[in-house]
Curated annotation (Swiss-Prot):
Name of the coding gene: rpsG
A cellular component term, taken from the record's GO annotations: small ribosomal subunit
Keyword field contains rRNA-binding: yes
Homology family: Belongs to the universal ribosomal protein uS7 family.
Domain of life, per lineage: Bacteria
Keywords: Ribonucleoprotein, Ribosomal protein, RNA-binding, rRNA-binding, tRNA-binding
Oligomer status and interactors: Part of the 30S ribosomal subunit. Contacts proteins S9 and S11.
Biological processes, Gene Ontology terms: translation
Function field: One of the primary rRNA binding proteins, it binds directly to 16S rRNA where it nucleates assembly of the head domain of the 30S subunit. Is located at the subunit interface close to the decoding center, probably blocks exit of the E-site tRNA.
Entry protein name: Small ribosomal subunit protein uS7
InterPro entries reported for this sequence: Ribosomal_uS7 (IPR000235), Ribosomal_uS7_bac/org-type (IPR005717), Ribosomal_uS7_CS (IPR020606), Ribosomal_uS7_dom (IPR023798), Ribosomal_uS7_dom_sf (IPR036823)
Molecular function GO terms recorded: rRNA binding; structural constituent of ribosome; tRNA binding
Lineage summary: Bacteria, Pseudomonadati, Thermodesulfobacteriota, Desulfovibrionia, Desulfovibrionales
Length: 156
């Protein structure tokens, strides 16, 4: 906790090609070693493939893919009398986006295709069609929250 009051949120500039803040956040998460140009090229290639295969506007297709991965519930550990319970909690909208971006990128990196652009486009296309590793991660998170509904009264 900061001693000098709440920390202000830093805003990100919209990306130059589509004018989307969400795309900029994705590119920043994708970036390695400060190489933003490389990350942008990979991302734009992947989004073009996604738009081509989905037959929809690139921005809308990307937003739909992110929307399909956003979790609504998650579990957080809560210690009560020596026992730790997994308490289901609603996920704040900002955290939903953060988790969705993280899961998509991690699952894309874990895929077997050759080249990051192909991996990313494959994962985005799977997310667009409500399947794939990132959507499975979301469903697992929801399943955990559902299984621990009995501890919902420990919410704080």
């Amino acid at each position: 906790m900061p001693r000098k009051g709440p920390v202000s949120k830093r805003s990100v500039l919209p990306d130059p090609k589509f004018g989307s803040h969400l795309m900029t956040k994705f590119i920043n998460r994708l970036m390695h070693d400060g190489k933003k140009g490389v990350a942008e090229n990979l991302f734009y290639q992947a989004v073009e493939v996604l738009a081509e295969k989905s037959g929809e506007d690139p921005l809308k297709a990307f937003e739909k893919a992110i929307g399909n991965v956003k979790p609504h519930m998650e579990v957080k550990p809560r210690r009560v009398g020596g026992a730790t319970y997994q308490v289901p909690m609603e996920v704040r909208p900002e955290r939903q986006v953060t988790l969705a971006l993280r899961w998509l990128i991690n699952q894309a990196r874990a895929r077997g295709e050759k080249g990051m652009a192909d991996k990313l486009s494959g994962e985005l296309l799977d997310a667009y069609h409500n399947r794939g590793g990132a959507v499975k991660k979301k469903e697992d998170t929801h399943r955990m929250a559902d299984a621990n509904k009995a501890f919902a009264h420990y919410r704080w």
